[in-house]
């Protein structure tokens, strides 16, 4: 497959020792370990770009490297084979992925992958909160156990998807996109995956035309920096607290408290990724949104996005510099 997905502007390593590439990937893309072949001196290459909540990565280890991951915890991996092949083992199965195929790893999927010497991949790391949000935005029902996809897919299932990724890469490398634009692209990718790939999400429309739910969600969006009580939400929805829980479980796949917390975290991340926001400190913005326990805030943020808020802010300042 010959597609321009990240160019020299995003180059991190070329002719590099595979362990150096692996260390970088562990920091930004996903926890794993590698095993090198006994003979030869593989030379790895890596391109990487952060685009809002997405990590975009083009990687080649330059040798028959085995990659083992215990799981991604809070993120999904889309791995598109560009060159060579990759042997995947999981769920008691194995398959040789070739160019034109896509491997999709769920947050709790363990991965055992063996690259061919000429294998090159393009990887998108997508936080689970983005897919949860896409479910809510499209009025689809998220299963209680979380969204899960099958592992094996063909890009022909995703009409125009590779062109969308090319557009995202171009946007990431050539423009200073506003956080809203970055969030929009991430939402499109998530919706595209949910719409066109097999998953356990029911796309039956639940909340369309439900004025109570829409009224509550709008109130939350307008008051993210305030302390929002469940009693106030129940009053707005004109129902009991128990019915409010059922409403959120049905239309958002989570509790009102978790929904509010996730929206606060998403808003904070957008600010940290926005150079024009002039964020002075993590503590200040956390307190602005009502997170009084800073240690718990940092842990919630990392669970949602796979990195600490200080990492997000540092990367934003690095890109501006």
UniProtKB/Swiss-Prot annotation:
Q: Offer an example of a GO molecular function term for this protein.
A: sequence-specific DNA binding
| DNA-binding interval(s) | 231-252, 282-305
| Principal location class | cytoplasm
The record's section on Pfam families has:
AraC_binding_2, HTH_18
Q: Per the UniProt entry, what are the Gene Ontology biological process annotations, in alphabetical order?
A: catabolic process; positive regulation of metabolic process
SMART domains according to UniProt: HTH_ARAC
Instruction: State the protein's purpose.
Output: Regulatory protein of the TOL plasmid xyl operons. XylS activates the xylXYZLTEGFJQKIH operon required for the degradation of toluene, m-xylene and p-xylene.
Instruction: State the name under which the record lists this protein.
Output: XylDLEGF operon transcriptional activator
Tell me the organism: Pseudomonas putida
The organism's lineage is: Bacteria, Pseudomonadati, Pseudomonadota, Gammaproteobacteria, Pseudomonadales
């Amino acid at each position: 497959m010959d597609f321009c997905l990240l160019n020299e502007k995003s180059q991190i390593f070329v002719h590099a020792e595979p362990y150096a590439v692996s260390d970088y990937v562990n920091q930004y893309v996903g926890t794993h370990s590698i095993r090198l072949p006994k003979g030869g001196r593989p030379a790895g290459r890596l391109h990487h770009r952060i685009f809002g909540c997405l990590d975009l990565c083009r990687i080649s280890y330059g040798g028959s490297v085995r990659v083992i991951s215990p799981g991604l915890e809070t993120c999904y991996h889309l791995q598109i084979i560009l060159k060579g092949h990759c042997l995947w083992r999981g769920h008691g199965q194995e398959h040789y992925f070739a160019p034109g195929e896509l491997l999709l790893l769920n947050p709790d999927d363990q991965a055992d992958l063996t690259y061919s010497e000429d294998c090159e991949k393009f990887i998108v790391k997508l936080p689970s909160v983005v897919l949860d949000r896409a479910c809510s935005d499209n009025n689809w029902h998220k299963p209680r156990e979380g969204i899960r996809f099958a592992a094996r897919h063909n890009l022909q299932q995703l009409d125009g998807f590779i062109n969308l990724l090319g557009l995202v890469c171009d946007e990431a490398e050539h423009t200073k996109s506003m956080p809203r634009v970055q969030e929009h692209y991430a939402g499109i990718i998530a919706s595209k995956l949910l719409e066109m790939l097999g998953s356990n999400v029911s796309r039956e429309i639940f909340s369309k035309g439900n004025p109570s739910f829409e009224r509550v969600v709008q109130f939350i969006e307008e008051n993210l920096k305030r302390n929002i009580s469940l009693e106030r939400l129940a009053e707005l929805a004109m129902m009991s607290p128990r019915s409010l829980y059922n409403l959120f479980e049905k239309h958002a796949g989570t509790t009102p408290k978790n929904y509010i917390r996730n929206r606060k975290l998403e808003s904070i991340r957008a600010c940290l990724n926005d150079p024009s926001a002039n964020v002075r400190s993590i503590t200040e913005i956390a307190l602005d949104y009502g997170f009084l326990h800073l240690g718990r805030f940092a842990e919630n943020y990392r669970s949602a996005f796979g990195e600490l808020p200080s990492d997000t802010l540092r990367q934003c300042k690095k890109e501006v510099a």
